[in-house]
């Protein structure tokens, strides 16, 4: 059950593959407020529109790749992702970044267009009127439209579900949060393993080893840890770990690691070109990690902790005791347990951040408006991953 660390480790390797899609960082000196501002707008818009963590990652990747392609078509600093956008000489990089993000977000989130129009107008007002501004807007619009076209029919919709088979020890069964289709509770996001990746070949390329066997001591150790500290009424879980579990259950990897990236980019004075590229890579990694994680999840179809605890009498392991009344602190999501989605997406995002900015020496503050009293400070990415790992065990 405690498969979080395995997911993070594998997603490190996965993130390296994504990272090689575009060339290594070069040197530049310009400031990049527009790229960072519209990254925050992109993430917040997806959240405000009620998107799942996996859809958030996909939309952020599309928006950031559009921004990167728009900026890079003007600066020429890196190998392009699309390579089809032609920018006039002297086009405004800031206008291009603003319009690229706006085009993607306004297309996917029509309910937010009024807010996005205001944000776009405010951002563009800071740029002097003239041909450079107009050329930048045209370049950004072209990049946004090109990314939208590329991702049409990418497998993210329509939703497909998995009907559970006959109950077997260790096999995933529907939990209370699962939707009902045709009178049967089904597994959600079954189709996400087939979403077209941004940088990797396929989910199959990152299939993990199977989870620990039910009879193993490793399984029993993880089982008893989760049963003890992860229950709804656990007396062994501190308030701090309860807070971490609740906070990170509501804070998606896209939200967390883009927040960290913006803070570090500002602190390090990264250029607009560097920021556009880094944010594209980070969100490619997070999104593709979701594809890979769902591939492994539905390949092994491992039962959730509450199913495991309720049915410990059939797991053939003398070191696990059944408790038919056990409930987790956090309601289980409706898909198999192994590997942790949160761990996989976080591991992918953190590894790219690590390679772009370095592991430590940072001043990172992670917040979520839904929990105004909870503020987490970190100096390196391993600290963030440790809290996320704990969150999936304690919650």
Question: What kind of region is each of these model predictions?
Answer:
Residues 8, 18-19, 348:
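A periodicity- and composition-biased signal for non-globular, repetitive helical segments
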Residues 1-12:
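N-terminal secretory signal peptides that target proteins for export/translocation
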Residues 15-26:
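Bacterial N-terminal signal peptides
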Residues 31-395:
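Acidic/polar surface patches and capping/hinge elements
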